[in-house]
Amino acid sequence: MPNWGGGKKCGVCQKTVYFAEEVQCEGNSFHKSCFLCMVCKKNLDSTTVAVHGEEIYCKSCYGKKYGPKGYGYGQGAGTLSTDKGESLGIKHEEAPGHRPTTNPNASKFAQKIGGSERCPRCSQAVYAAEKVIGAGKSWHKSCFRCAKCGKGLESTTLADKDGEIYCKGCYAKNFGPKGFGFGQGAGALVHSE
């Protein structure tokens, strides 16, 4: 069919795409309303689109349809592994830990000085403008970091042990289960003799 209007054709509906409604992706033009995942129909943008030939997908559906398959894939980011790569010649360096909590008396009364609480990491007064609450204590925003790797934390992404706070990854590495069979997920094969 001839293109009399001079506009580009949408990669999904094949109708003319005018400039005001155009989204471009890998040399193709789409209507904004047609720039959807072919499977789940979610709206896409330049950061969420994955292209396969002439088809467009969200990254999640693309991975399910065209990603690697088989044993060891699809376990997700939440699995634990104790392999540090020594068999491949990778040398593991421990990150320097942050200074542990120095406050031996963690009672609420002892932490209150002049109407403000003390930060368990630096023992300085914590005022409302810089206060973050985690593990039942008040911290400075700048002190609210993993005691091992220094990663900034949120009250929902921390784990605490012995008065110190850790990111979930460091907590799992240092205090989680260890040994063969842990962290493989529900569908893992179990080696038994």
From Swiss-Prot:
The modification N6-acetyllysine is found at K84, K112, K131, K137, K161. A motif (Nuclear localization signal) lies at residues 64-69. One of its GO terms (molecular function) is metal ion binding. Its main location: nucleus. Keywords: Acetylation, Isopeptide bond, LIM domain, Metal-binding, Nucleus, Phosphoprotein, Repeat, Ubl conjugation, Zinc. GO terms for biological process: actin cytoskeleton organization. InterPro entries: Znf_LIM. It holds the Pfam family LIM. The modification Phosphoserine is found at S81, S192. There is a cross-link at K91 (Glycyl lysine isopeptide (Lys-Gly) (interchain with G-Cter in SUMO2)). Gene3D superfamilies: Cysteine Rich Protein (2.10.110.10). Residues 10-61, 119-170 form the LIM zinc-binding domain. GO terms for cellular component: actin cytoskeleton; nucleoplasm. It is found in: Nucleus. It comes from the Eukaryota. Could play a role in neuronal development. Interacts with ASCC1; ASCC2 and TRIP4. PANTHER family: CYSTEINE AND GLYCINE-RICH PROTEIN 1, RHO-GTPASE-ACTIVATING PROTEIN LRG1. This is Cysteine and glycine-rich protein 1. It comes from Mus musculus. The gene is Csrp1.
